[in-house]
């Protein structure tokens, strides 16, 4: 026998769905500001130009001499991917969400493991007794491995969602998945990676500080301040991006539908600008730490070579 639904319940469901859609469309309309949208677009274009200028400067002026140049150019390319994805969303009425969301996912997820790689290299360099070679091979292999793994993850997500998945949640706005369950799953995956990165960066920062405290360095206080400040800022940034984990109990409610909040809609522009400043700060800190470490190891090696000759 075929079971049929009561007419009243069917009509009630349709009315509830229509009411939800209308409420979402109203929220999308109320959160739109022509001024803020224009300023966000200008800011994103400026960030793209600055990022491209930085990449060209590293390639043609610095010529990738230092290992830090390789890390920095990777961070800038990852930021460029994210900003390009967001700018396409701003200039497209549909947001081209399947393309732009995966561009932003690729840039941000690669950036997580790039920061971790830099922290790990600082830790390994501190435990090394000889100056590290200037070869970029290991760094390039690590970055290529990260890129391939994240790209594979994106392909798996695309296969799971389907090539025709609708990720649009309003004009110039996208969601993580076509359904609330998928949206929650992708959001939880990203936030979980950010939380893991934050915890590992804090752990590596503590290890570096512990090792510095047990080592005789001429610039030890300055190096400890350097490592502590940049490590905590980096970890705090990833902790903030992992906050959606607190709201996963409400299936997909965070970012699935439009809200009337202007901050929720237009924060990515200033956030990307802040990310560029943090990349520059982190790259400077990394370069300063490695140079100080190399100089200290070189001076120590010269001292030990000089001592036997003086004793004879």
Swiss-Prot record:
Quote the annotated effect of residue 241 to F.
Answer: About 10% loss of constitutive Gi signaling
This protein's record includes keyword Electron transport = no
**GO BP: any one term:** negative regulation of NLRP3 inflammasome complex assembly
Q: Which residues lie on this side of the membrane: Extracellular?
A: 1-40, 89-95, 160-192, 250-269
Record keyword Disulfide bond present:
yes
Note the SS bond partners: 28-258, 97-174
Inducing stimuli: Expressed early in the viral lytic cycle.
Q: Name one GO cellular component term.
A: host cell mitochondrial outer membrane
Consequence of substituting residue 75 to A = About 50% loss of constitutive Gi signaling
Upon changing residue 121 to A, the result is: About 50% loss of constitutive Gi signaling
Classify the protein's membrane topology as the record does.
Answer: Multi-pass membrane protein
Q: Where in the cell is it found?
A: Host cell membrane; Host mitochondrion outer membrane
Cite the effect that the entry attributes to residue 240 to F.
Answer: Slight increase in constitutive Gi signaling
**Which key words are in the record?**
Disulfide bond, Early protein, Host cell membrane, Host membrane, Host mitochondrion, Host mitochondrion outer membrane, Host-virus interaction, Inhibition of host adaptive immune response by virus, Inhibition of host innate immune response by virus, Inhibition of host interferon signaling pathway by virus, Inhibition of host MHC class I molecule presentation by virus, Inhibition of host PKR by virus, Interferon antiviral system evasion, Membrane, Transmembrane, Transmembrane helix, Viral immunoevasion
Q: What is known of its domains?
A: The extracellular N-terminus and third extracellular loop are involved in host MHC-I down-regulation. The cytoplasmic C-terminus is also required for host MHC-I down-regulation.
Tell me the protein family, please. Belongs to the Epstein-Barr virus BILF1 protein family.
Q: How does it assemble?
A: Interacts with host CXCR4 to form higher-order heterooligomers. Interacts with host Gi heterotrimer.
Function text: Constitutively active, ligand-independent G protein-coupled receptor that has immunoevasive and oncogenic activities. Couples with the host inhibitory G protein (Gi) in order to disrupt the host chemokine signaling. As a consequence of its constitutive activity, mediates host CXCR4 inhibition. Enhances degradation of host major histocompatibility complex class I antigens via lysosomes, thereby modulating the antigen presentation to cytotoxic T cells. Targets selectively HLA-A, HLA-Band HLA-E molecules. Targets also newly synthesized MHC-I/peptide complexes en route to the host cell surface.
The name this protein carries in UniProt is G-protein coupled receptor BILF1
Which organism does this sequence originate in?
Epstein-Barr virus (strain B95-8)
């Amino acid at each position: 026998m075929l079971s049929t639904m009561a007419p009243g319940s069917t009509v009630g469901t349709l009315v509830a769905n229509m009411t939800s859609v209308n409420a979402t469309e109203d929220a999308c309309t109320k959160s739109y500001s022509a001024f803020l949208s224009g300023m966000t677009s200008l800011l994103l274009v400026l960030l793209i130009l600055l990022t491209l200028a930085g990449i060209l400067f590293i390639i043609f002026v610095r010529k990738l001499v230092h290992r830090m140049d390789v890390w920095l150019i990777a961070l800038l390319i990852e930021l460029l991917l994210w900003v390009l994805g967001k700018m396409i969303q701003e200039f497209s009425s549909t947001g081209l969400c399947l393309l732009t969301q995966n561009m932003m996912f690729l840039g941000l997820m690669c950036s997580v493991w790039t920061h971790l790689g830099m922290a790990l290299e600082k830790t390994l360099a501190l435990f090394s007794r000889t100056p590290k070679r200037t070869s970029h091979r290991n760094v390039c292999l690590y970055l290529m491995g990260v890129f391939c793994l994240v790209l594979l993850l994106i392909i798996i997500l695309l296969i799971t969602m389907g090539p025709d998945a609708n990720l649009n949640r309003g004009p110039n706005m996208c969601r993580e998945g076509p359904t609330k369950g998928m949206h929650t799953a992708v959001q939880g995956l990203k936030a979980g990676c950010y939380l893991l990165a934050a915890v590992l960066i804090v752990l590596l920062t503590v290890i570096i500080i512990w090792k510095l405290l047990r080592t005789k360095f001429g610039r030890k206080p300055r190096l400890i301040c350097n490592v502590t400040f940049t490590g905590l800022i980096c970890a705090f940034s990833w902790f903030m991006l992992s906050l959606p984990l607190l709201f996963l109990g409400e299936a997909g409610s965070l970012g699935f539908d439009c809200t009337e909040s202007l901050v929720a809609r237009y924060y990515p522009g200033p956030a990307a600008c802040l990310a560029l400043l943090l990349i520059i700060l982190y790259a400077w800190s990394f370069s300063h730490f490695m140079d100080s470490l190399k100089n200290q190891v070189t001076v120590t090696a010269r001292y030990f070579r000089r001592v036997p000759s003086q004793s004879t």
